[in-house]
């Protein structure tokens, strides 16, 4: 696809948005606030398409998200706050500033250096912003822990290597075990359990594993294996709740 075709396709979307915003009873009443939960839903649908490795569905979901981005820009324009040009120029400038090794004279040897430079550049340009200011509170907790550890590592607050990071996991595991010796103190148990989860999430940065991706794959594996257990129960004319634990374990192992 050449440049003209891309521009024409984008203009077509903008024109359609202008039309539905002006004439559709539903589109004309939407606000930035009313669209928020719908955008979250669309993002999760894109995530599911990616997990399913369904590129045709990824294409469709990207279109849905693109519509939402144009929708927000249209509302911003109506309110005199910003328009699509401001949005696009803003991200273009951000990309140029954050890639001095592409658009400037800086040299980097690997992706880790690029990430560290990003954090340095952001702090220099936004003097009063916390290192963790770019991690939304609304992120799922496991992913948020991973990103917080990643962000602080970018400014040097990190273990030297994966071995040290794992030692922290072992330390937190021991502290949780000790807390469990007093099970009535549920607040302390919860705190230590949280510390262990955070340490495991942070450890992912040292072994190149995103914990959210890893857990998602394990969730999928668990679902598929338990579906096999349920299928084996149906073959016997039983509900899964009527299987013995030994039977469940045997069918579970079959699914591995």
Each model region followed by its residue ranges:
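Flexible "arm" and connector segments at domain edges
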Residues: 1-61, 67-193, 197-256
């Amino acid at each position: 696809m050449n440049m003209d075709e891309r521009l024409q396709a984008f203009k077509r979307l903008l024109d359609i948005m202008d039309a539905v915003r002006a004439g559709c009873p539903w589109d004309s009443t939407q606000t930035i606030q009313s669209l928020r939960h719908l955008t979250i839903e669309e993002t999760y649908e894109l995530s599911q398409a990616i997990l399913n490795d369904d590129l045709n569905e990824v294409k469709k979901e990207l279109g849905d998200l693109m519509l939402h981005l144009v929708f927000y820009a249209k509302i911003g324009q109506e309110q005199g706050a910003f328009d699509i040009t401001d949005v696009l120029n803003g991200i273009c400038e951000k990309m140029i500033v954050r890639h001095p090794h592409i658009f400037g004279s800086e040299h980097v040897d690997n992706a880790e250096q690029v990430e560290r430079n990003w954090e340095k550049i952001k702090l220099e340009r936004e003097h009063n912003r916390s290192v963790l200011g770019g991690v939304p509170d609304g992120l799922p907790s496991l992913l948020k822990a991973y990103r917080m550890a990643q962000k602080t590592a970018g400014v040097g607050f990190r273990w030297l290597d994966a071995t040290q990071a794992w030692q922290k996991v072992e330390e937190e595991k021991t502290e949780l075990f000790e807390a469990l010796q007093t099970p009535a103190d549920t607040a302390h148990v919860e705190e230590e359990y949280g510390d262990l989860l955070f340490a495991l999430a942070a450890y992912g940065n040292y072994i190149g594993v995103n914990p959210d991706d890893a857990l998602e794959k394990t969730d999928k594996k668990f679902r598929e294996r338990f579906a096999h257990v349920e299928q084996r129960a149906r073959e016997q004319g039983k509900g899964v709740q009527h299987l013995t634990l030994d039977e469940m374990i045997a069918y579970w192992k079959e699914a591995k």
